[in-house]
UniProtKB/Swiss-Prot annotation:
Residues 1-26, 38-83, 132-159 are annotated as: Disordered. Belongs to the Stoned B family. GO terms for cellular component: cell leading edge; cell projection; clathrin-coated pit; cytoplasm. GO terms for molecular function: cargo adaptor activity. One of its GO terms (biological process) is focal adhesion disassembly. This is Stonin-1. The keyword Cytoplasm applies.
Amino acid sequence: MYSTNPGSWVTFDDDPAFQSSQKRKDFSLETQGVCRPNGLKLTLPTLRDPPSTPSSASSTPLSSPMVDFYFSPGPPSNSPLSTPTKDFPGFPGIPKAGTHVLYPIPECSSSSAPTTAGGVGPPLLLTKPDCSPHVSLPSSHSHTQPTPTLGFTEDAGPQRVQSEARQFEYFQDHCAFSNPFWKDEGSASPFPLDSLASRKPFSPKDKEVPIGHKSLTQCSLDYICEKLEHLHSAETQDPLGDLSMQDPYAGDTVSFVPHSLFRSQPRAGWSFMLRIPEKKNMMSSRQWGPIFLKVLPGGILQMYYEKGLEKPFKEFQLDPHCRLSEPKLENFSMAGKIHTVKVEHVSYSEKRKYHAKTEVVHEPEVEQMLKLGSTEHRDFLEFLTTVEEELIKLPATAKPKNKSYEEQEICLDIQDSLWGKVTKEGQLVESAVVTQICCLCFLNGPAECFLALNDRELQKRDECYFEKEPEKKGIAILDYHFHTCVKAEEFEQSRIIKFVPLDACRFELMRFKTSYEAGELPFAVKSVVTVQGAYVELQAFVNMTPAAQGSPHAGALRSCNNIMIHFPVPAQWIKALWTRNLQRQKSLKAKMNRRACLGSLQEPESEPVIQVTVGSAKYESAYRAVVWKIDRLPDKNSSPDQPHCLSYKLELGSDQEVPSDWYPFATVQFSMLEACASRTEVRSLGVESDAQPQKHVCQRACYNIQVEIEKKWIQVDGEDADKTGGCVTQ
């Protein structure tokens, strides 16, 4: 009746269709049967058979339902009790436990004519679900088949095989059992909390991989496994396949340190998540829905149901009153977290408050317009940068008539963003400072404002603005960009910024670029990773620099706030940073351990994987890195010169999980209030009137530093000496 192959695959020898298909010499790749991972090999009819062939001879009827013993609970997939459903559990295309997902039949391109059986009728195209190999869509073919059949057209054959191979690979990565024909690759991670968030949906437009022709029978299992191996190796060689080893700003066209005022790059769009319904409602719950998002010139947000559609289902026009909220990291599902941001509409109203002293204030009224999210950190940062740069390019709006304020006010917010690269020796080799000046005005009438900075060119032309400190040199403005309300011709002549501000609207007045002349950062970061066989240990040390400890500008010690240090983790190491239980998987987390301070003689009873002396550290799948968070430095409970350290130790399964071409960089982000990295100062601010409004100037500096991690490779017995590369060998 049947015979078993050495690979535990069962084939029916008495099936006439199977015997006849083996005798055919022209049995091509497009017409072969596909091996199913449930232990059965189904032999399927060819599309080139003549129409006179009876349908009963092309398949084997099933007298009883085929039970899938691995995907329980639920009735058999081909029984009347099984109802195919399609749901969105958090990630597109990933079904919930106990459900079966039916995927639609891809449409053929209009340029290629599909071929059918006998040349008549629609093409017979069926796709295999990811997690349920027995469920398939019914065909609209004229001949009724008792069992589902699978075929490929001549034009879409290679793409179809590639789709099948990728679905089989996904099935391999996330199943609870193994198969002797599946090869365990180091880059495959069986932990869904990171792999599902980083996996991209398959697109039929992906590039095809050339496969060498071998003297193998095309309907044999070895041929199928050979093709899957080639497809898998092509994916691992894709430079965009493993994002865990890439920096958010790494690439050929984008550098970590910006070389211009505008850092956004032309993009066709991003795959985002939209919070629906858009506004909170007491009668309904909100959920995430997948969309494809585009940002057009002029501040137009276009949202599509999926990539490739011609017309968007929604358009949103940004106006000068719109702004982006602070980015947050929120729980998405069991598969990890999501980066979220809100598009808000902000308006201001004047109110009188009665406290111990009566005062008039201008309070903002915030209305949420959209809430967007993304599981890809790099796409999320690109979207934020693009929207911020589109807002400064919007035209100015006219002020409403007959609107007056009881209390006039001008507020300036100066923010410096420092971008720099630091070598493993601690030297700052590349840096740039981009300064953004935001303005908020409440003025009566069409008043014209003026602003004078400590510009070096202004110091040469008019020294009256530098009478108090004539020996202090001004800053060199390398490049600048103004809002549309600024009179650019006046600035070229007098180096004084004159503008007619927007009424009750916070807008970016100008941005300019300067060089970082301080020469020393507020604190230094030193990172070392040691590899010895399959044992990996990373150590990071943080200490305040002498310049930050003795700041001459303020009596109190300036502090660095909201410090985040990201240490990238290769995909092969993720499984060592997760713990499992019956309910879920969770990341290993380390909080402040006083006994792990430098110079301490006490050792903990059980040594954890991650240790820190201040703050907290854990693996964040949203960043694909170990994130060390510190609220404030210097710490309140330690002296300013006290160094702090982080250490995490991993015992990998094999030394093959350590990539030899891994050159990691740690990313450091923090902010300082009442600080200035560009040395920008306001020399004069006011309006062309005798009655001057109240003036408020706030300054802060945001630092983004990329630090090179030193690699030390300790060679063990039997290890290839060439694997260490340029690392230090002890």
